[in-house]
Amino acid sequence: MPKMKNNKGAAKRFKKTAGGIKYKHATKRHILTKRTTKNKRQLRPNAILPKCELAAVARMLPYA
């Protein structure tokens, strides 16, 4: 039986850790002048994926 393939887009965006699957927040790349300092600071740390999304990401990353 052939090996299953990872979804390459998901592999670049998500990382499996002991605490769950972590990812970076969206809307933090460019045109940040309209965002407040508080909002940019809150988007800084990596986030942990919520439970409702775990199954979808697990399907995309079979070996994670």
From Swiss-Prot:
Keywords: Ribonucleoprotein, Ribosomal protein. GO terms for cellular component: cytosolic large ribosomal subunit. It comes from the Bacteria. Belongs to the bacterial ribosomal protein bL35 family. This is Large ribosomal subunit protein bL35. It comes from Vibrio cholerae serotype O1 (strain ATCC 39315 / El Tor Inaba N16961). One of its GO terms (biological process) is translation. Pfam families: Ribosomal_L35p. SUPFAM superfamilies: L35p-like. One of its GO terms (molecular function) is structural constituent of ribosome. The gene is rpmI. PANTHER family: 54S RIBOSOMAL PROTEIN BL35M (PTHR33343), LARGE RIBOSOMAL SUBUNIT PROTEIN BL35M (PTHR33343:SF1). HAMAP family: Ribosomal_bL35.
